[in-house]
Amino acid sequence: MIRQVIQRISNPEASIESLQERRFWLQCERAYTWQPIYQTCGRLMAVELLTVVTHPLNPSQRLPPDRYFTEITVSHRMEVVKEQIDLLAQKADFFIEHGLLASVNIDGPTLIALRQQPKILRQIERLPWLRFELVEHIRLPKDSTFASMCEFGPLWLDDFGTGMANFSALSEVRYDYIKIARELFVMLRQSPEGRTLFSQLLHLMNRYCRGVIVEGVETPEEWRDVQNSPAFAAQGWFLSRPAPIETLNTAVLAL
């Protein structure tokens, strides 16, 4: 700790640059869009709430949301999650009327920190159609059990096939739905052997969850492949591009 302080004193330019970068991310502004998730039969099953991040100095340029959430603190991330929950709560009638789910992205540390927020937990209990989508797999603390994580409702796992979300995740937590990353989907489609492996992989994953959702479907051919696979649902630009949250009531309920 003392060494870090000495290093900062001896290198004031780096310290100033760090403060400026932190201030930059704190000045960023958020807006929200939604993207539908369709079952392979064409029925709308859920919508994902997506965060659009911009900076006042260049509001037309979108910044990477994952970088934004990495740069802000856990307490700030909890404020964002609360903001997202409040926004979706205003659309409760839409989700209830059509029997739809809504997913909100969240990282592991923020999810665990939410356990200390009784007001937010009570709000979550009043929204049975809300789902938290983990953007990374988290190992449960030693004093935690899966039962203790169920207070958030059924959990989804995002980006299966990336570094953080892999097979080790399947045995530790019983996820409701698991999303396969587009990168893995595209890689396996490149050869007949890969297509066979993709089908086998989905069969295996279905043993550990209610269904697999394929992300990043961008062409008619990709959508057809997903429909002919053991996948439960899909999401991507071919099905629908993200739209402003204000237009949620215009969602196409069946393709």
UniProtKB/Swiss-Prot annotation:
Gene Ontology terms for molecular function: cyclic-guanylate-specific phosphodiesterase activity; nucleotide binding
Biological processes, Gene Ontology terms: regulation of bacterial-type flagellum-dependent cell motility; regulation of single-species biofilm formation
Domain EAL: 13-255
Entry-linked Pfam families: EAL (PF00563)
Induction field: A class 3 flagellar gene, it is dependent on the master transcriptional regulators FlhC and FlhD, and then FliA for expression. Induced in early post-exponential phase at both 28 and 37 degrees Celsius, it shuts down later than class 1 and class 2 operon genes. Expression has to be shut down for adhesive curli fimbriae to be induced, i.e. on solid medium where biofilms form. Repressed by RpoS.
PROSITE patterns in alphabetical order: EAL
Catalytic activity, reaction form: 3',3'-c-di-GMP + H2O = 5'-phosphoguanylyl(3'->5')guanosine + H(+)
Enzyme nomenclature, EC number: 3.1.4.52
Hydrolase as UniProt keyword: yes
Effect of inactivating the gene: Disruption leads to increased expression of adhesive curli fimbriae genes, including CsgD. Also leads to a severe reduction in swarm size and swimming velocity, and 80% reduced concentrations of c-di-GMP. Disruption of ycgR, or concomitant disruption of dosC, dgcE, dgcQ and dgcN completely restores motility, suggesting these 4 genes, together with this c-di-GMP phosphodiesterase, form a network that regulates cell motility by altering levels of c-di-GMP.
InterPro entries: Cyclic-di-GMP_PDE-like (IPR050706), EAL_dom (IPR001633), EAL_sf (IPR035919)
Annotated keywords: c-di-GMP, Hydrolase, Nucleotide-binding
Cellular component per GO, a single term: plasma membrane
Functional summary from the UniProt entry: Involved in the control of the switch from cell motility to adhesion via regulation of cellular levels of cyclic-di-GMP (c-di-GMP). Part of a signaling cascade that regulates curli biosynthesis. The cascade is composed of two c-di-GMP control modules, in which c-di-GMP controlled by the DgcE/PdeH pair (module I) regulates the activity of the DgcM/PdeR pair (module II), which in turn regulates activity of the transcription factor MlrA and expression of the master biofilm regulator csgD. Effect on flagella is controlled via the c-di-GMP-binding flagellar brake protein YcgR.
Record's protein name: Cyclic di-GMP phosphodiesterase PdeH
Source organism per UniProt: Escherichia coli (strain K12)
Lineage: Bacteria, Pseudomonadati, Pseudomonadota, Gammaproteobacteria, Enterobacterales
Designated gene of the protein: pdeH
